[in-house]
Amino acid sequence: AIGPVADIDIDVVSLGMVDQSLLREMHEVSNVALQAMKGSDEYDFNANLRLVLWNQPDFMWLR
């Protein structure tokens, strides 16, 4: 994969989080974000993904 999805995989692996269900969940988040950014050149994918993850209880330790 190229683009944001590939970046997510790298970030997840670098954090030592290799759980497949988590990877799938993050891919789903990325796909939603990619759909939302269509037609908008100013959409900040990474900032929005961080905002999504920031508000997920399972990611509290990332703070």
Curated annotation (Swiss-Prot):
**Reactions catalysed according to its record:** 4 hydroquinone + O2 = 4 benzosemiquinone + 2 H2O
Name any GO cellular component annotation: extracellular region
Q: GO molecular function terms here? A: hydroquinone:oxygen oxidoreductase activity; metal ion binding
UniProt keywords (A-Z) are: Copper, Lignin degradation, Metal-binding, Oxidoreductase, Secreted
Query: Cofactor note from UniProt?
Result: Binds 4 Cu cations per monomer.
Post-translational modifications reported in the UniProt record: Glycosylated; contains 16% carbohydrates.
What cofactor does this one take?
A: Cu cation
Record's keyword annotation contains Oxidoreductase: yes
What is said about its interaction partners and assembly? Monomer.
Q: What is this protein called?
A: Laccase-C1
